């Protein structure tokens, strides 16, 4: 009876489907001419319908027809006229075309729930495919890169390589293209340690987008939680996409990099009561979806997509955890970023970090060992949960994004929170014993402006989406540096380049886990579109024809990443401890905060609403951590200088207690200048809107007694 799904054993295939409401289930097999053979599933145990069919081979296409009650008013939507995808399908062929047969109601009378649409959907929907599970992994192993040593690169399978002339044309925009040696070599040289792929679970192309000549580019519309998206395969749709994906993961592991998946377990592509019947709705609607109490025709929606999975249902929970285990054990992925993860915590009405889902994940010996990253919000009441996830999770830190953007556009009263975000957001995470790596720091991501657009546009420009520029976030916390969009004014372009360097330096020298939005390192633009979910074209794809300025930005970002990874004080495992208020002793703390005069900042400095500058000392000799060999870590000391003012500021370096000699290693105003040396108490100019980093010239050595 188990496992669920279609399991090939070399001699045949076992099919198993869960449905509590089904009265009869037919397995539908399709030949090369799409002729359908129906086989009634005669075996049933504990609501699992199963049959073993000898002689079937990988590549066999199939689906299900489920007979049972059709009573939408009570949440029952069985309709045997609809060919249904296997929820556990490991491969899926085709797409949907928006035909009326995909829906369980008639277009002419959508409100008449008693009139069941009896059109057959088989010719208009996707089909599940049997796969061969055997694959030569060789000696492949998970890299298991420590959280604090991680630098994440968010990427899109198609967007990463579609315009990459180094990749052969026939594999651009595919898993094979992403695994092409020059692509992996580029990421290794950049210095990132993990690629986080936007959704690659099989998703649906919405008909309303297709009618406008657009498509679901981002992929947050999952219908197959076990199947890699077929459109990203260069080798076929009947299982070939599985091997192509595995080969990609194997190539990244060989290069010492991790593969993290952006997963969407909070809803499915079947939408609300007006959506199509593709799988779960027709199999056992009430076991998978959260329905409105007292009005079970409608779906409870905290995701903005029309439905939400029922997180107190053991069968929905089993589906999700089985999927997660499959992607770790069979596909060898190294972690997950959970879209709208607050929905997964809604066992009942409210978000609850003690919900069954988190209990299951915490104790699971497979899932709990990989990286778990939450997008810690959804659209429901109380859905903003930054800092509220269990201790073993990391979170996208939305407050980090907002604060860094505000600081570099000189918004009042941002300095205190900016300082907290730089140090790992202990105010959000330390209270429940978490560490800096609980914070995934980012300034841009797929959703919103790119880094280049963040410094080039004050307003969104989403006209290409066909929604009258009404979609997308209006409050972007962006600043166009004086001109909206592209310009030939040298001073404006110079400032934009400097602002991008400022934000990259902030991101890569903050405690926590940095995440870079793919293409930002080469100043990718979406022409001001901050909601390019439907733009599978040059608006979203990365343009790899790099001019001098884009090449220089790439080199700068790579330099910063390697500098971060080479110095443990820049990515500590524990939060800093600083000087207590009123402490005027000569003890040198782990971190010290100075104003531009070289004086330790006091309460008046922090409360100055128009303060946009500071100097930070990081003590590399006081790192309470050990390396892999049990030796206490030591590092150089660093000084970080931030100036978000519109004019230059002269900073006096700290006295010699903090270090005698310093070398300038990063200057966002003059990124190509040779390194200069400074002594304690010397003055150094931070140009307007710029960042400086100085490193002590002392050689790190073990503390006495070790």
Language-model segments: residues:
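Short catalytic/ligand-binding loop motif for oxyanion handling, primarily in non-cytosolic enzymes
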Residues: 71-75, 161-163, 203-207, 267-270, ...
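Conserved, mostly hydrophobic/aromatic
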Residues: 17, 64, 155, 197, ...
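Core domains of carbohydrate- and sulfate-ester-processing enzymes
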Residues: 68-137, 206-221, 275-300, 415, ...
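Conserved alpha/beta catalytic core and glycan-binding cleft of carbohydrate-active enzymes
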Residues: 353-518, 523, 531-535, 568-575, ...
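Short, flexible loop/turn elements at secondary-structure junctions
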Residues: 21, 43-45, 55-57, 68, ...
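Substrate-binding/active-site clefts of carbohydrate-active enzymes
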Residues: 121, 156-333, 340-363, 383, ...
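Carbohydrate-interacting/catalytic domains
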Residues: 1-153, 158, 487, 492-497, ...
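Hydrophobic faces of well-ordered beta-strands that scaffold small-molecule active sites
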Residues: 151-153, 195, 259-261, 336, ...
């Amino acid at each position: 009876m188990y496992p669920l799904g279609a399991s090939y054993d070399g001699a045949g295939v076992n099919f198993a489907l869960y449905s509590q409401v089904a009265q009869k289930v037919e397995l539908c097999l399709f030949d090369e001419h799409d002729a359908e053979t129906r086989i009634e599933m005669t075996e049933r145990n504990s609501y699992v319908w199963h049959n073993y069919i000898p002689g079937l081979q990988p590549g066999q296409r199939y689906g299900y027809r489920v007979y049972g009650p059709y009573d939408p008013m009570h949440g029952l939507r069985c309709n045997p006229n609809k060919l249904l995808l296997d929820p556990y399908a490991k491969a899926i062929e085709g797409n949907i075309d928006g035909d009326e047969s995909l829906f369980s109601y008639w277009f002419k009378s959508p409100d008449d729930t008693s009139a069941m649409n009896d059109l057959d959907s088989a010719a208009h929907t996707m089909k599940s495919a049997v796969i061969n599970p055997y694959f030569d992994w060789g000696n492949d192993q998970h890299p298991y890169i420590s959280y604090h040593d991680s630098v994440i690169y968010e990427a899109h399978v198609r967007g990463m390589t579609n315009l990459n002339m180094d990749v052969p044309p026939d594999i651009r925009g595919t898993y094979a293209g992403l695994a092409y040696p020059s692509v992996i070599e580029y990421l290794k040289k950049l210095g990132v340690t993990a690629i986080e792929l936007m959704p690659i679970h099989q998703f649906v192309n919405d008909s309303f987008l297709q009618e406008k000549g657009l498509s679901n580019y981002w992929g947050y519309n999952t219908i197959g939680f076990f199947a890699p998206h077929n459109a990203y395969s260069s080798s076929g749709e009947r299982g070939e996409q599985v091997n192509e994906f595995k080969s990609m993961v194997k190539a990244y592991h060989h290069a010492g990099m991790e593969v993290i998946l952006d997963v969407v377990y909070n809803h499915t592509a079947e939408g609300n009561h007006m959506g199509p019947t593709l799988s779960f709705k027709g199999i056992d609607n009430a076991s998978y979806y959260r329905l409105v109490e007292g009005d079970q025709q409608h779906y409870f929606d905290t995701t903005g997509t029309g439905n939400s999975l029922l997180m107190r249902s053991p069968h929905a929970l089993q589906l999700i955890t089985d999927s997660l285990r499959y992607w770790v054990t069979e596909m060898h992925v190294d972690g997950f970023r959970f879209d709208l993860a607050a929905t997964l915590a809604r066992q009942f009405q409210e978000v609850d970090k003690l919900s069954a889902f988190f209990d299951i994940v915490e104790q699971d010996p497979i899932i709990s060992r990989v990286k778990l990253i939450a997008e810690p919000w959804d659209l429901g009441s109380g859905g903003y949960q930054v800092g509220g996830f269990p201790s073993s999770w990391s979170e996208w830190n939305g407050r980090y994004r907002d604060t860094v953007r505000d600081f570099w556009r000189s918004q009042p009263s941002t300095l205190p929170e900016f300082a907290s975000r730089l140090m790992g957001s202990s105010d959000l995470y330390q209270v429940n014993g978490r560490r800096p790596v609980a914070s995934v720091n980012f300034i841009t991501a797929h959703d919103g402006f790119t880094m280049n657009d963040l410094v080039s546009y004050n307003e969104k420009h989403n006209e290409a989406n066909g929604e009258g520029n009404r979609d997308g976030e209006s409050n972007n916390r962006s600043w166009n540096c004086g001109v909206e969009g592209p310009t030939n004014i040298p001073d404006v372009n110079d400032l934009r380049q400097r602002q991008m360097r400022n934000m990259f330096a902030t991101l890569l020298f903050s405690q926590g886990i940095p995440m870079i939005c793919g293409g930002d390192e080469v100043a990718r633009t979406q022409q001001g579109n901050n909601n390019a979910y439907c733009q599978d074209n040059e608006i979203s794809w990365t343009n790899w024809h790099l001019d001098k300025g884009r090449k220089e930005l790439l080199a700068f970002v790579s330099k910063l990443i390697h500098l971060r990874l080479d110095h443990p004080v820049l990515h500590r495992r524990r939060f800093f401890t600083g000087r207590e208020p009123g402490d005027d002793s000569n003890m040198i703390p782990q971190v010290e905060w100075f104003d531009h005069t070289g004086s330790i900042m006091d309460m008046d400095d922090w409360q100055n609403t128009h303060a946009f500058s500071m100097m930070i000392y990081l003590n590399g000799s006081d790192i309470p951590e050990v390396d892999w060999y049990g030796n206490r870590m030591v590092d150089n000391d660093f000084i970080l200088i931030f100036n978000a003012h519109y004019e230059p500021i002269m900073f006096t370096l700290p006295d010699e207690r903090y270090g005698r000699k310093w070398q300038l290693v990063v200057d966002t105003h003059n990124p190509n200048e040779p390194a200069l040396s400074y002594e304690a108490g010397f003055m150094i100019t931070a140009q307007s809107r710029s960042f400086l980093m100085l490193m002590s010239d002392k050689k790190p050595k073990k503390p006495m007694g070790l």
